[in-house]
Amino acid sequence: MAKKDTTPMMKQYYEIKEQYPDAFLFYRVGDFYELFEDDAVKGAQILELTLTHRSNKTKNPIPMAGVPHLAVDTYVNTLVEKGYKVALCEQLEDPKKAKGMVKRGIIQLITPGTMMHERPDQAKDSNYLTSVISTNSGFGLAYSDLSTGETFSTHLTDFEGVANELLSLQTREVVYNGHLTEANKDFLKKANITVSEPVKVEGEHAEISYVTQNLTDDAEIKATKQLVAYLLSTQKRSLAHLQVAQSYEPTQYLQMSHTVQTNLELIKSAKTSKKMGSLFWLLDKTSTAMGGRLLKSWIERPLLSVTEITRRQEMVQALLDDYFTREKVIDSLKGVYDLERLTGRIAFGSVNAREMLQLAHSLGAIPDILNSLLETNNPHLQNFAKQIDPLKGIHDLIVNTIVDNPPLLTTEGGLIREGVSDQLDRYRDAMNNGKKWLSEMESHEREVTGINNLKVGYNKVFGYYIEVTNSNKDKVPTDRYTRKQTLTNAERYITPDLKEHESLILEAEAKSTGLEYDLFVKLRENVKKYIPALQKLAKQVASLDVLTNFATVSEQNNYVRPDFTVDKQEINVVNGRHPVVEQVMTAGSYIPNDVKMDQDTDIFLITGPNMSGKSTYMRQMALIAIMAQIGCFVPADSATLPIFDQIFTRIGAADDLISGQSTFMVEMSEANDALQHATKRSLVLFDEIGRGTATYDGMALAGAIVKYLHDKVGAKTLFATHYHELTDLDQTLKHLKNIHVGATEENGKLIFLHKILPGPADQSYGIHVAQLAGLPHKVLREATTMLKRLEKQGAGELQPASEQLDLFTAEEASVPAISDDEKDVLDDIQNVYLADKTPLQVMELVAQWQQELKDKD
């Protein structure tokens, strides 16, 4: 509400701000966007702006901060990335022509889910706005990336499914129509997801009808309508690039919860939350941003159809076999900009001339790609090329209209080529002739007045002028020159002739600039008609980029094409490798392992020391399955796999910070998910189930879970455990086999073999692993003593508290009486490598050890 005794401009500000109380209002004043009141105070702090005040002479000056209009995107992005909303209030008329107060209005509400201007490092990330409708039968869910227009919808039975989709999509904003429980609110808050209210839009909108035209499920239709309505309300313009919503069932793809994707580090490293170290990092050698985004979506949604997988494999094989064609395609792809987002900006009306040329250059690369594919003898590559329309007409239209190096702004001229418009060419002739006259006038005035340094200049305030230095102003002909401006070292004048030509030149410039902008808008609207064709082309190019990328990665890393068994669940991976781990190890040092599970083997019970590679082996199997089902080749000598419908994991020992569950509760929840939903066609990875609780509880639960998986589920399961007692289960469970990760002891030191061997491990080597971790020698000695006592009395014969062994009993006397410091010196002596030491260095080491022992006496 407007304050009393305020100016008309501030009254206008308060009226607009009242409509957007939860958003930062960027209010356009001249060349700046201003923030006022609380927006200014908070915005100055977040954006590191200088906080000033308006109406300083009043009792209550108004806090104010501003940003240049040319840099506004940077500041807006900063706020939106932090979860805030920004309302852009623009001047709706030319201030010079306005009668009274300049009209202003909101041209766009930018929210976390509708941000269009991504940073360069976000080019391969999607930004999904999600809409959720609560119904009697469950939930309708729809989502769209405004920058590309792609739109999807599905329906889910419970909020747990909704939460999983939101996390998997990494959505930053959800439009939600139903009642949220406190638990759901807490989840959304911890997940940093902004919750927005639905909005109603008046009248019929073509976008809503177009996007929902293929949907049949009522919940999906409502969710999609709610999504598009919100976009129309916030963006306040035509959204012609929104694509027809694609309905999907989660069961259409290999299902993996967000937790599974995180555990397997498909898109980000679990430790750093960065791309590096993930499967996406390994596989992403794509040449285009849209190819990178498509690759990410393929990794998150592997296929179930052998036919579709084979189609991708055939393309990968063809590109792998033809190195020169592949390299030519890659070179051409490097010249393709982000067609999807360029198309979005064209529809949005925010594209500039340089981006329009980027579109043309991208289209210019398509014929080279097609020629490379058509020149091969491979029918798969040829058929792919024949389906692509290069849209040559659009390319020619743009390059024949826009100059080679246009300015960034579309409102200051210099955009349009000569010959495009006769009227524009006439304006330019007038401008050129006028400027030629100015040059001739400058020469003439120098000659007439004798002022050799006289010059004709221009600025936006005073227009054209004649500048004369103070040392020559006595030579100025006062009968023709009228003083216009006084400077420190010069005077500026005008003449009647100069004023007359100024009007002609400026009028031509203004009309030329205006006409150029009109011609650019006309070009943009013409290209806009081809948005569906451009979007189709973008998808085809992105797909080719990913498949070419698969061929390159497969060749570089010696991957093999996997085969699939449709009628039986058998795994036969020979010398499989963890695709990511092998890349960060020294070349040739990775130890490959087989995974062979026939019809009669459902469960591998894996034992072996910690740090020996059990978890790597399990993840390796899952990643090979995922790579196979996205159409990529896999890290192995050979691989025959079933088509998995779901993957379940229980890997890692971290609390679930979003749901607030403890480690053990997370263990049980993830285990229950697998027990409830896994089928015979699923892959289950359980690592150290039961470690989050007491020993006997954990062992009992782990054993019961193994038995249930064996008797009731029948899924292919890799079950790693430190409970060696469970290895006896192979006596009663006929589909369970024991395997272990090999290790050996040399000179009292543990050597990991990293090789999977048949049968159970004979010991756990826990104290040796603790030694590798650097635990104090005293702790290790006491642990060794305690272990010997326990082994003597029997692993299962734990005594009552009153009879428990004292860690410091007389038996410890059998341990040599040596201090920790002495042990440190002995370790140094044992570990020193004398071959790379000079005699002098050896003498220095001996002296150092002697001194250390003396100091401890």
From Swiss-Prot:
Xref: Pfam families: MutS_I, MutS_II, MutS_III, MutS_IV, MutS_V
Record's keyword annotation contains tRNA processing: no
GO terms under cellular component: cytosol
InterPro entries named among the record's database cross-references: DNA_mismatch_repair_MutS (IPR005748), DNA_mismatch_repair_MutS-lik_N (IPR007695), DNA_mismatch_repair_MutS/MSH (IPR017261), DNA_mismatch_repair_MutS_C (IPR000432), DNA_mismatch_repair_MutS_clamp (IPR007861), DNA_mismatch_repair_MutS_core (IPR007696), DNA_mismatch_repair_MutS_N (IPR016151), DNA_mismatch_repair_MutS_sf (IPR036187)
Keyword DNA repair: yes
Sequence positions that bind ATP: G608, P609, N610, M611, S612, G613, K614, S615
Residues annotated as transmembrane: none
GO molecular function, one term: ATP binding
Entry keywords, A to Z: ATP-binding, DNA damage, DNA repair, DNA-binding, Nucleotide-binding
SUPFAM superfamilies reported for this sequence: DNA repair protein MutS, domain I, DNA repair protein MutS, domain II, DNA repair protein MutS, domain III, P-loop containing nucleoside triphosphate hydrolases
Family of this protein: Belongs to the DNA mismatch repair MutS family.
Function: This protein is involved in the repair of mismatches in DNA. It is possible that it carries out the mismatch recognition step. This protein has a weak ATPase activity.
Record-given protein name: DNA mismatch repair protein MutS
Source organism: Lactobacillus gasseri (strain ATCC 33323 / DSM 20243 / BCRC 14619 / CIP 102991 / JCM 1131 / KCTC 3163 / NCIMB 11718 / NCTC 13722 / AM63)
Lineage: Bacteria, Bacillati, Bacillota, Bacilli, Lactobacillales
